[in-house]
């Protein structure tokens, strides 16, 4: 992994950040207990302190992801309360502000519903990682047994090289190594298949969640277009608000767009830089085929002129003469080549 894009190094600013510099960090970040609460820190440290040695790191990751789910659930609940409060606040304002804030509250409430759905799908990713952890935990005993037998053999060879137990332990070591090989192969296969399945769950859910939120944001901006923000002078009256039907239709369209969205209709597609290199490599095979076709066409043209078939027949005859005559082949070959 390139260091510029590694977790161990800070990233270069993006084009969006260069165009619009990001705001300063929020004042509420880590205000009381740093980056996580006391319960979060305890769960994280406890997950890596117990269980088989092989599965401790993944156990810690699974526990951290559980904390992520709890944080997202808290965010969804808070967003739902914020949507309700926005609608309550707008109720006491003018007709246009009241209607727009009510509809915006509906959209923000829908975002919280999408957060709940995302949590359910994200949990499938965590459970799949958890299955890898369980497999790692089952492989650890076979490793420990093999290491224990190896240590016993080394101890006996040092203390009593003639001990009859050494041969018995060596046979047990062969069986333990065979069992360990089978377990390691299963772990290798399951790790790869489960890892792909887990992150497919996560990335598919991220794509769906982000694109649906982008849809909601687009319809929210359409609602804002109905709000007249032109300044008025003191004593001037604003025109009567007539956007009730339009705002209602925007909500209906948003609901329809969310219901009809599928993963196949995702708008954002990745652009891979190495794909072009692969495409550049492909025509080389086509060029070889074209060269072969060109040679075939050239041979056909030559055969029409009678310039290829006769020398081949003469060469075959020369080979036969070489097998039969031997010494006369040296005389016949120059004649055939000149012919």
UniProtKB/Swiss-Prot annotation:
Residues 279-293, 301-318 have a biased composition (Acidic residues). One of its GO terms (cellular component) is mitochondrion. Residues 1-19, 326-339 have a biased composition (Polar residues). It is found in: Lipid droplet. Phosphorylated by PKH1 and PKH2. Phosphorylation is inhibited by sphingolipid long chain bases (LCBs). GO terms for biological process: eisosome assembly; endocytosis; protein localization; protein localization to eisosome filament. The modification Phosphothreonine is found at residues 14, 233. There is a cross-link at residue 29 (Glycyl lysine isopeptide (Lys-Gly) (interchain with G-Cter in ubiquitin)). The modification Phosphoserine is found at residues 16, 45, 98, 163, 230, 299. GO terms for molecular function: lipid binding. Keywords: Isopeptide bond, Lipid droplet, Phosphoprotein, Ubl conjugation. The keyword Phosphoprotein applies. Disulfide bonds: none annotated. Residues 1-31, 273-339 are annotated as: Disordered. Present with 2157 molecules/cell in log phase SD medium. Negative regulator of cell wall integrity (CWI) in unstressed cells, probably by inhibiting protein kinase PKH1/PHK2 activity and regulating their downstream CWI pathways PKC1-MAP kinase pathway and protein kinase YPK1 pathway. Activity may be regulated by the transient increase of sphingolipid long chain bases (LCBs) during heat stress. This is Sphingolipid long chain base-responsive protein PIL1. It comes from Saccharomyces cerevisiae (strain ATCC 204508 / S288c).
């Amino acid at each position: 992994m390139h260091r510029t894009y590694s977790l161990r190094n800070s990233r270069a600013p993006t084009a969006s950040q260069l165009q619009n510099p990001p705001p300063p960090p929020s004042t509420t970040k880590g205000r009381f207990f740093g980056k996580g609460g006391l319960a979060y820190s305890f769960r994280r440290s406890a997950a890596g302190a117990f269980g088989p040695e092989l599965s401790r790191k993944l156990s810690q990751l699974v526990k951290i992801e559980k904390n992520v789910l709890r944080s997202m659930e808290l965010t969804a609940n808070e967003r739902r309360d914020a949507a309700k409060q926005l609608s309550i606040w707008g109720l006491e304002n003018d007709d246009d502000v009241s209607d727009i804030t009510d509809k915006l509250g509906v959209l923000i409430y829908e975002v919280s519903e999408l957060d709940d759905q995302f949590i359910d799908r994200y949990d499938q990713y965590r459970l799949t990682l958890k299955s890898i952890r369980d497999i790692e935990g089952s492989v650890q005993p076979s490793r420990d047994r093999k290491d224990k037998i190896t240590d016993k053999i080394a101890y006996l060879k040092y203390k009593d090289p003639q001990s009859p137990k050494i041969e018995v332990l060596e046979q047990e070591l062969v069986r333990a190594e065979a069992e360990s090989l089978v377990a390691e192969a299963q772990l290798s296969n399951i790790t790869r298949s489960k890892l792909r399945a887990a992150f497919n769950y996560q990335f598919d859910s991220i794509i769906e969640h982000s694109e649906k939120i982008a849809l909601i944001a687009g319809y929210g901006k359409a609602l804002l277009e109905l709000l007249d923000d032109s300044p008025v002078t003191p004593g001037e009256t604003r025109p009567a608000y007539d956007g009730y039907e339009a705002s209602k239709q925007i909500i209906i369209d948003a609901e329809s767009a969310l219901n009809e969205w599928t993963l196949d209709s995702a708008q954002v597609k990745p652009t891979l830089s190495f794909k072009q290199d692969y495409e550049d490599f492909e025509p080389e095979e086509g060029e070889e085929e074209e060269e072969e076709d060109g040679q075939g066409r050239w041979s056909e043209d030559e055969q029409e002129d009678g310039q290829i078939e006769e020398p081949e027949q003469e060469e075959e005859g020369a080979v036969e003469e070489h097998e039969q005559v031997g010494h006369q082949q040296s005389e016949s070959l120059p004649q055939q080549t000149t012919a």
